[in-house]
């Protein structure tokens, strides 16, 4: 028998979705159609059917009594609950978020559910039954539906259903469903907003009329981007943020520079006129860049707060600035002045990334960068993304540029809340901006605003968009600007009258004309094809003594080989480390990894922080580094470099995600914003670094020449031909050498642990100086433990990095030397190994070998001095393991011709031209390599008399 207790009502605590669940469970309980939750089954047995008795107050203040004791009412409640959730989840399909469309096209998703309930049904259900947090004045379910449709289907549309954290999802719904998000703006703020829109529109139209045909990539159609950025920056400053980093492409960039970053109009106009104007700050390198790629740094303030805003320099390679700016932010957030890991404070800075609607889903770098957002080594406490959505990519319509409904859909996979907003509704746009910054500051996670507008002109101002989008541009031609729309709204609301609005417009025009009048005539007197590189750059890195006292090295080594008591090091790793114990003693040998650790420790002791990342950088791809140890029992980690004495600089080494482009961009950005830090990126294999080629081309190699943006980033690229096939042999040094010019970076391929030690210390010594430049290192694989690459303690404690090294025990009879062999990296070691073996029958008196350790800048003076010693020299040969069309040959050939003069032949020995870097057969590789070595060491292997004829090894 069912027992009833009428004194209590356990159902009162169930509302909304929970109520729907209880009703479904009771239906199963009554019909026996399925299993019922045991706790609810007990309640049903004790209390019977769920009772939600309440008085429903209707709009005419009459009260009706409602009790869902019968099945019909239960079903209606369930349908209302489902409808409420559908509005929250799919209301965006009904929203008017596209100013170029009259109505939303998603009616069918909700109309069925809405048609199943009459107004009378809805009026009979208390609001609190289906919406526990219903605000004051919402009495019935009909009120609930009207209110939620007003929230979710107007010019703001929300996508929160994909958010996995229930607390975050509840907070987001509460924010948009309460009145807190869209509080009416004061008349003062509404007037200020109109003034801002008038300035943006006036600036763009002034450029359009004054500099006819010049590219400016107008913001018009998404003008609200500027006030949105204003709002985010201001609210960030109110929250104590010290640095706001902005990354964006060229669309709207000039207006953002002029308004958000307060670049004077006169300076902008001077760039269009190619005029010199007093007070303009040079923001470019010696070759420069177009005006819509340039960045700026500015302290932005109002009467209450201030913050520093940095707009990053940017190429036209869309979205590749994203990880760079994330690196800026992480560098700004971290305190690197203590030993151990840096101390991060994500409240100190945050990132705003402005995306294009075609580029956001189209460029893979976007996904790579989003993937960094929750990773310990890369997270920055949340980025605010703004898609400046003009619904077209150059001439490509959205249906040809993405496979998703919205351009923002990619963000759903990364648990990012999304707000779509009509760019013709200024106050809705500001509400979206406020929600974004509040969410970021509270939850320390990313947020996305899809600012949907249009593009008033073509991709650039010389392009006619009506050729490819004729129907849309008929609409756009007759569509009022957002400034005009908002001005009409303020006039209708009595905030401003027509004369006051006209006064605002005239003030903007007078300001533009006044600033233009300050710009002198064009001045092309300094236009020249001869670009002057700064002297400190042109001179290259001067010799620097980088040795470390032997006692200091021994003390460091002792610290590197110690760990906390009770810490259980993996036995195999322990043996590797213990072998290093006597490496600095007499007759000891230092291998590559130990030389690196000693360099790191000595650099840290001199006050330089270090950051190293890569896919396997803690252990090392080749199980050589072991700079982070793992306890075999607890999996806790320990790095000896965190506990060494006399260190006041941080050390961080992180395993990166399986990404090259985003990580290289991030580390480059980190280094730019933390110039005192030795920042290093290590490829798993150098072969894979080419997926970051755009970063090497646009930023690392050219950033200083274009923008004056200095970097000391170190690239560690494992390289060497060992019969492992075309994906595990070549870091493609030819590409880095092709980009080498104007002393833009150092490219090296080393042959000893000591050389690695010294070049790292040299790189650390130039950080933060005008001499700084990136360092590209072809690092070893099989050579990591090769006997011929090992070094002695004295080679670390004395001297400096040597750009060129002579092979020991050769060239001792200068008058007999006929052939000078130049080589680098593993190829040089293969030659040395053959020389030291007892198998050869070469006449070594007639040959000398020079290892070119630093390929760029080439050590010409050093090599020339060596050549002069050999009066009977007949030929200079470049020997490499790469195919002739790869490696350093095409870079070296003109250098050799100049070094050789008229009397000495030059030549090449190596693999022939090939389309693939390496073959896949290890036996064929070995045979080829042996033949290259034998031809290089056999002086009888003759070359043609004409020095321009290159002898090529072939099978």
Swiss-Prot record:
One of its GO terms (molecular function) is oxoglutarate dehydrogenase (succinyl-transferring) activity. Its EC number is 1.2.4.2. It holds the Pfam family OxoGdeHyase_C. One of its GO terms (biological process) is tricarboxylic acid cycle. Keywords: Glycolysis, Oxidoreductase, Thiamine pyrophosphate. The gene is odhA. InterPro entries: 2oxoglutarate_DH_E1 (IPR011603), 2oxoglutarate_DH_E1_bac (IPR023784), DH_E1 (IPR001017), KGD_C_sf (IPR042179), ODO-1/KGD_C (IPR031717), THDP-binding (IPR029061), Transketolase-like_Pyr-bd (IPR005475). It comes from Bacillus cereus (strain AH820). PANTHER family: 2-OXOADIPATE DEHYDROGENASE COMPLEX COMPONENT E1, 2-OXOGLUTARATE DEHYDROGENASE. It comes from the Bacteria. It catalyses: N(6)-[(R)-lipoyl]-L-lysyl-[protein] + 2-oxoglutarate + H(+) = N(6)-[(R)-S(8)-succinyldihydrolipoyl]-L-lysyl-[protein] + CO2. It is an enzyme of class 1 (oxidoreductase). Homodimer. Part of the 2-oxoglutarate dehydrogenase (OGDH) complex composed of E1 (2-oxoglutarate dehydrogenase), E2 (dihydrolipoamide succinyltransferase) and E3 (dihydrolipoamide dehydrogenase); the complex contains multiple copies of the three enzymatic components (E1, E2 and E3). GO terms for cellular component: cytosol; oxoglutarate dehydrogenase complex. This is 2-oxoglutarate dehydrogenase E1 component. SMART domains: Transket_pyr. E1 component of the 2-oxoglutarate dehydrogenase (OGDH) complex which catalyzes the decarboxylation of 2-oxoglutarate, the first step in the conversion of 2-oxoglutarate to succinyl-CoA and CO(2). Its cofactor is thiamine diphosphate. Belongs to the alpha-ketoglutarate dehydrogenase family. CDD domains: TPP_E1_OGDC_like. Gene3D superfamilies: 3.40.50.12470, 3.40.50.970, Multifunctional 2-oxoglutarate metabolism enzyme, C-terminal domain. HAMAP family: SucA_OdhA.
């Amino acid at each position: 028998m069912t027992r009833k207790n009428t004194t209590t009502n356990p159902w009162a605590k169930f509302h909304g979705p929970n109520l729907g669940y209880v009703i479904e469970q009771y239906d199963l309980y009554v019909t026996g159609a399925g299993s019922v939750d045991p706790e609810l089954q007990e309640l049903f047995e004790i209390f019977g059917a769920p009772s939600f008795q309440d008085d429903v107050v209707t709009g005419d203040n009459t009260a009706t009594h409602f009790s869902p004791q019968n099945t019909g009412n239960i079903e209606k409640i369930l349908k209302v609950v489902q409808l409420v959730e559908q509005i929250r989840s799919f209301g965006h399909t009904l929203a008017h978020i596209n100013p170029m469309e009259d109505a939303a096209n998603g009616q069918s998703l909700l109309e069925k559910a809405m048609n199943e309930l009459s107004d009378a049904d809805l009026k009979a259900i208390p609001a609190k039954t289906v919406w526990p947090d219903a605000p004051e004045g919402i009495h019935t379910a009909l009120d609930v539906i009207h209110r939620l449709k007003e929230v979710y289907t107007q010019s703001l549309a929300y996508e929160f259903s994909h958010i996995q954290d229930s607390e975050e999802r509840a907070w987001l719904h509460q924010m948009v469903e309460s009145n807190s998000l869209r509080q009416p703006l004061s008349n003062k703020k509404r007037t200020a907003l109109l003034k801002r829109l008038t300035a943006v529109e006036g600036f763009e139209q002034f450029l359009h009329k004054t500099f006819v045909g010049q590219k400016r990539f107008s913001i018009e159609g998404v003008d609200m981007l500027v006030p949105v950025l204003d709002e985010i920056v201001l609210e960030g400053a109110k929250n104590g943020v010290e640095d706001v980093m902005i990354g964006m492409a060229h669309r709207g960039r000039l207006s953002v520079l002029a308004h958000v970053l307060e670049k004077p109009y006169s300076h902008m106009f001077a760039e269009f006129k190619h005029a010199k104007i007093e007070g303009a700050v040079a923001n470019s390198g010696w070759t420069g860049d177009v005006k819509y790629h340039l960045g700026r740094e500015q302290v932005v303030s109002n009467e209450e707060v201030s913050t520093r805003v940095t707009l990053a320099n940017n190429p036209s390679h869309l979205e590749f600035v994203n990880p760079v700016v994330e690196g800026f932010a992480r560098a700004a957030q971290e305190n690197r002045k203590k030993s151990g890991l840096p101390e991060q404070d994500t409240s100190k800075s945050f990132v705003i990334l402005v995306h294009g609607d075609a580029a956001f889903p189209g460029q893979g770098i976007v996904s790579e960068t989003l993937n960094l957002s929750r990773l310990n080594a890369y997270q920055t406490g949340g980025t605010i993304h703004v898609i400046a959505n003009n619904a077209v990519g150059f001439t490509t319509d959205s249906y040809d540029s993405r496979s998703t409904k919205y351009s923002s859909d990619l963000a759903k996979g990364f648990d990012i809340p999304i707000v779509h907003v009509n760019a013709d509704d200024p106050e809705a746009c500001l509400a979206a901006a406020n929600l974004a910054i509040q969410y970021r500051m509270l939850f320390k996670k990313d947020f996305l605003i899809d600012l949907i507008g249009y593009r008033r002109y073509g991709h650039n101002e010389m392009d006619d968009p009506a050729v490819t989008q004729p129907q849309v541009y008929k609409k756009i031609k007759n569509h009022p600007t957002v400034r005009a729309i908002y001005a009409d709204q303020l006039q209708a609301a009595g905030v401003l009258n027509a004369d006051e609005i006209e006064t605002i417009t005239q003030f903007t025009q007078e300001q533009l004309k006044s600033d233009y009048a300050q710009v002198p005539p064009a001045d092309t007197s300094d236009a020249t094809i001869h670009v002057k590189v700064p002297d400190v750059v042109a001179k290259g890195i001067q010799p620097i003594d980088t040795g470390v006292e032997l006692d200091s090295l021994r003390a460091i080594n002792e610290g590197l080989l110690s760990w906390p008591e009770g810490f259980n090091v993996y036995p195999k790793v322990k043996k590797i480390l213990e072998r290093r114990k006597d490496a600095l003693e007499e007759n000891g040998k230092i291998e590559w990894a130990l030389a690196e650790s000693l360099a790191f420790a000595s650099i840290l002791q001199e006050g330089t922080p270090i950051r190293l990342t890569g896919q396997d950088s803690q252990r090392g791809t080749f199980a050589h580094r072991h700079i982070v140890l793992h306890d075999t029992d607890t999996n806790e980690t320990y790095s000896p470099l965190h506990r060494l004495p006399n260190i006041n600089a941080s050390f961080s080494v992180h395993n990166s995600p399986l990404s090259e482009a985003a990580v290289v961009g991030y580390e480059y950005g980190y280094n730019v914003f933390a110039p005192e830090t030795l920042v290093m990126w290590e490829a798993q294999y150098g072969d894979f670094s080419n997926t970051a080629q755009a970063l090497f081309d646009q930023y690392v190699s050219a950033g200083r020449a274009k923008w004056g943006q200095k970097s000391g980033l170190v690239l560690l690229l494992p390289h060497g031909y060992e019969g492992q096939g075309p994906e595990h042999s070549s870091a493609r040094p030819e590409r880095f050498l092709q980009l080498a010019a104007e002393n833009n970076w150092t490219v090296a391929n080393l042959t000893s642990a000591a050389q690695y030690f010294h070049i790292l210390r040299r790189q650390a010594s130039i950080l933060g100086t005008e001499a700084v430049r990136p360092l590209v290192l072809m690092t070893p694989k099989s050579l990591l433990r090769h006997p011929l690459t090992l070094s002695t303690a004295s080679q670390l404690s004395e001297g400096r990095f040597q750009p060129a090294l002579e092979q020991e025990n050769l060239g001792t009879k200068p008058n007999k030397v006929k052939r000078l062999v130049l080589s680098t990296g593993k190829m040089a070691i293969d030659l040395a190994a053959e020389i030291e073996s007892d198998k050869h029958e070469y006449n070594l008196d007639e040959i000398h070998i020079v290892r070119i350790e630093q390929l760029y800048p080439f050590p010409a003076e050093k090599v020339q001095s060596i050549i002069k010693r050999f009066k009977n020299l007949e030929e200079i040969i470049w020997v490499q393991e790469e195919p002739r069309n790869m490696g350093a040959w095409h870079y070296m050939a003109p250098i050799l011709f100049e070094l050789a003069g008229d009397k000495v032949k030059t030549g090449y020995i190596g693999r022939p031209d090939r389309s693939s870097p390496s073959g896949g057969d290890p036996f064929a590789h070995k045979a080829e390599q042996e033949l290259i070595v034998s031809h290089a060491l056999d002086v009888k292997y003759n070359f043609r008399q004409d020095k321009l004829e290159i002898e090529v090894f072939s099978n």
